[in-house]
């Protein structure tokens, strides 16, 4: 197993808030970081002085970047896997490209999980309006049409309530390759957040109960209630199967619906995740520190709760203006990362 010692340089694809938090954790452990991003600045620029402005399609720029660092990771999954393949020819990339190929294609993701025995919503591929109308007949009209790629935070989606909604939904997503997912009746949402080391060791954090508003995560609370706790073991077993099948290294998150039939897989993120931000102060070792430990071949840190109850509240837009009120409670911890949108 290759060990990347402190003092080495970690390359990060993407310069957003997740890249920033990875860089902060890396610095704590004595690593330098180097950002590669198509933007010329971003939240990570405040904490990582080394920044390469380049396109993910620029093989020459990627190769030069890979040669300047000791290991590469990424902060989000909407990167062409061929870029990761280019980097891998020059050195270590963790997680690998296969995780991207699965996670950024919703249809491939659902099939991958089903092949491992996971429970998902009923789904069907959609390449045309005719496909959509046929899928509605099979799955039912209470469904969600999602673009097969590039959707996040509720984007690239259209809800259907009756068969007549098919045309409008197809137009709403831009008439592109998609997946129709049947409606799932559920009581709560939760995530399984794990870290897998280069040696195959796996640790899990407590699974938080997640609340979304308009498709965006609002709060994550751990420990979750009894309904979720009763489904965590089964969900963790599936998550470990996914991580092992991908030979995954780093932090991996799977999101689930807690239903009467058990945990229903929704989607996965091959990276640190916003439902795990509470681990910064709320767990013995944060998801960001353990991600750095994993990709560098270091022993994984303990993942237990550092307090009896932890809640993460996501500050969106004007919520940030309440920073002074938030800090009046001495038990609160505020994280602002300079995102301007």
Where are these regions (language model features)?
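Glycine-rich active-site loop/lid that clamps phosphate-bearing ligands
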Residues: 306-309, 313-341
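Short, low-complexity Ser/Thr-rich regulatory SLiMs
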Residues: 194-198, 256-260, 338
């Amino acid at each position: 197993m290759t060990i990347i010692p402190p003092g080495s340089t970690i390359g990060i694809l993407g310069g957003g808030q997740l890249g920033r938090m990875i860089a902060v954790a890396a610095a704590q452990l004595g690593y330098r970081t180097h950002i590669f991003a198509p933007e010329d600045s971003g939240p990570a620029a405040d904490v990582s002085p080394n920044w390469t402005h380049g396109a993910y399609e620029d093989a020459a720029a990627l190769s030069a970047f890979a040669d300047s660092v000791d290991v590469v990771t990424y902060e989000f999954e909407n990167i062409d896997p061929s870029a990761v393949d280019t980097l891998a020819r020059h050195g270590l990339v963790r997680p690998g490209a296969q995780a991207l190929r699965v996670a950024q294609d919703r249809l491939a993701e659902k099939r991958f999980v089903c092949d491992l025995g996971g429970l998902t919503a009923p789904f069907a591929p959609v390449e045309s309006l005719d496909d959509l109308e046929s899928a509605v007949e099979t799955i039912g009209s209470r469904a969600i049409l999602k673009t097969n790629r590039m959707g996040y935070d509720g984007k690239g989606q259209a809800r259907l309530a009756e068969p007549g909604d098919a045309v409008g939904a197809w137009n709403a997503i831009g008439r592109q390759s998609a997946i129709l997912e049947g409606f799932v009746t559920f009581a709560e949402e939760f995530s399984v957040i794990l870290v897998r080391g280069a040696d195959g060791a796996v640790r899990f954090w407590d699974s938080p109960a997640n609340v979304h508003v308009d498709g965006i995560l609002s709060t994550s609370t751990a420990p979750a209630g009894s309904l979720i706790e009763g489904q965590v073991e089964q969900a963790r077993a599936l998550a470990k199967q996914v991580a092992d099948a991908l030979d995954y290294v780093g932090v991996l998150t799977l999101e689930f619906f807690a239903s009467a039939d058990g945990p229903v897989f929704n989607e996965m993120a091959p990276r640190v995740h916003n439902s795990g931000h509470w681990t910064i102060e709320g767990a013995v070792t944060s998801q960001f520190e353990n991600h750095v430990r994993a990709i560098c071949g270091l022993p994984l840190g303990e993942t237990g709760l550092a307090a009896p109850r932890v809640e993460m509240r996501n500050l969106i837009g004007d919520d940030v203006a309440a920073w002074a009120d938030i800090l009046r409670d001495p038990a609160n911890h505020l994280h602002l990362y300079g995102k301007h949108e």
